[in-house]
Structure formats: C-alpha cells, structure tokens
From Swiss-Prot:
InterPro entries: LytB/IspH. (2E)-4-hydroxy-3-methylbut-2-enyl diphosphate binds at H41, H74, H125, T168, S226, S227, N228, S270. Belongs to the IspH family. Its cofactor is [4Fe-4S] cluster. It catalyses: isopentenyl diphosphate + 2 oxidized [2Fe-2S]-[ferredoxin] + H2O = (2E)-4-hydroxy-3-methylbut-2-enyl diphosphate + 2 reduced [2Fe-2S]-[ferredoxin] + 2 H(+); dimethylallyl diphosphate + 2 oxidized [2Fe-2S]-[ferredoxin] + H2O = (2E)-4-hydroxy-3-methylbut-2-enyl diphosphate + 2 reduced [2Fe-2S]-[ferredoxin] + 2 H(+). Dimethylallyl diphosphate binds at H41, H74, H125, S226, S227, N228, S270. Binds 1 [4Fe-4S] cluster per subunit. One of its GO terms (biological process) is terpenoid biosynthetic process. The keyword Oxidoreductase applies. This is 4-hydroxy-3-methylbut-2-enyl diphosphate reductase.
Amino acid sequence: MQILLANPRGFCAGVDRAISIVERALEIYGAPIYVRHEVVHNRYVVNDLRERGAIFIEEISEVPDNAILIFSAHGVSQAIRQEARSRNLTMLFDATCPLVTKVHMEVARASRKGKEAILIGHAGHPEVEGTMGQYNNPEGGMYLVESPDDVWKLKVKDEDNLCFMTQTTLSVDDTSEVIDALNKRFPKIIGPRKDDICYATTNRQEAARELAERADVVFVVGSKNSSNSNRLAELAQRAGKPSYLIDSAEDIDEIWVSHANIVGVTAGASAPDILVQQVLARLKAFGAEEVIELSGREENIVFEVPKELRLDYKVVE
C-alpha cells in the first residue's frame, strides 16, 4: 500500500497567526486568556490551548473585568466588537484572519455607500455571522445565499444597486455556480475585484482534487466543524472516491483501507501537522510501505501578530 500526501495541506497563514496570538498571550500575560469562540476549528488545537490556560467563551458577558480577550480567526460582528470595547478589559487582541478582515471591509464599504450586499456562505458559521454583522445601513440590505436556488428566490430592494462577497472557505466549484446565478439574476451586480475565497482554501482544494484522481481512498484530517476541511472531503467524494473526515489517527478503521493500493492523505487549514504524522504512522501499521508527497503550489505568506505580542516588542515609557 502506498500513501500519497497532498501539497499544500494543513495550517494556513491565518490559522498560524491566530494560534500564535493565543500562545504568545499565554506566555506574556499568563493564564487565563479568554478567547471568543474556538480560535480555529480544530479539536486538537483547542484542547491543547485549553490545557495551557485558554478559556473559550461565546458571550462577552462571560469575560470578567480586567481580563485579556482574543477574537477568533473567524472574526466578529461590529456589535460584538463594540461590546468588548465597552468592557473593562486589560487587553483586547484580534486574531481575525486578515483575509476575512478584507471581506469585512468590503461589506462595511457597501453599507456606507448604501448598496445592498449579498454574501455567499453557510448559515450559522461564525465567519458568516461576523461578516454579516459589518452591515448596519437600514436603508440598504444584507442577504445570505448558499445555493443557486437561494439566488433565484431572493428578493432585494433595488436590483441595480447590488454587490456580493463570499465566505473565505467555500468550495470553489460550488461558489462559481452561485456567482453565475447571481450574474444571471442580477446583471448589474458588482463582485469583488479579486475572489474572496482565500488562497489557502483554493490551493488545498486543487491539491485534494489531484489526490482524489490518483488515490483509491482519501483521508482528510480536520474537525467536523471546520468548513474548509468539509469541503475537501466533499471534493474527494464528488470525484467518486471514498473519503473520510477524521479528527485523529484513531478514527481510522483498518477495513477502510483493506482493499486500497493507494491511500491519499490531506489536511484542512486548521489541522496541525502532528495529526498528519500520526495518521501516516497508523497507515504504516496497517501495511503502508511508501509515502510520496505530491508537488503543489508553494505557500510563503506570513501574517504578523500584533506588535504587543512580538518577541522584539519594547514598551516605551
């Protein structure tokens, strides 16, 4: 049995930055550090940070006075940001991915101009809630669509004054279909100058597609609440290959690979490499003899943490 390893896979720049913010806050200020929502959607990462003193909350009211609070990588609404700023907090750090912030700015700009905005995204996802929460113009409107059917059913105030944005972790193929429907339904709608789906999501989907073409079965390392990990598993399934979204190596049943000659392995953008290595070890225990890493797009993007958390930061008195 041979293992093919997708490339790129695992942590993206936004996830790496968010985790680093929590880790450095713990190092500098000590526990407890409060984090609004899971900083990234990965059970291993969240449990590790929790053991080190991070406390994950959903409501700002759960944070005591004089505490340190961090917003997760998914971003928050303007209302939550204002609520946090009104509290007596020692420090407030924003771990929102800069590429999510870019979409927030697009929505805020539309709100200021009075344009109605349509977001392509999954209802209930924290990134979607945060992005929708950037719009506050009562004269306009903010709408959420998930599918072409949603587009055809949508009613807006002014079809000539529309723009759209997308969640950053969507399926590239599915989103393209929704955008096509938007352009047909609303010919004058304006989209972003550059696709809102982030580079990491796009690259990992391209790598997963190649993996699915060559493997007999595909494993995606990632948690069930991870949007981008789910999209990778769906992509492999659409290619006609059995695919499994797994939190850890222990999730793998040997029967899943009993008839496979080639096993594909990839990981969502919030899954650490240690989990991938554990999966490889388990597959080797099941008889895998060779691991081949596929070629793929090189990623060298780095997002800096806030200056107060940088190792070279000095307080000016």
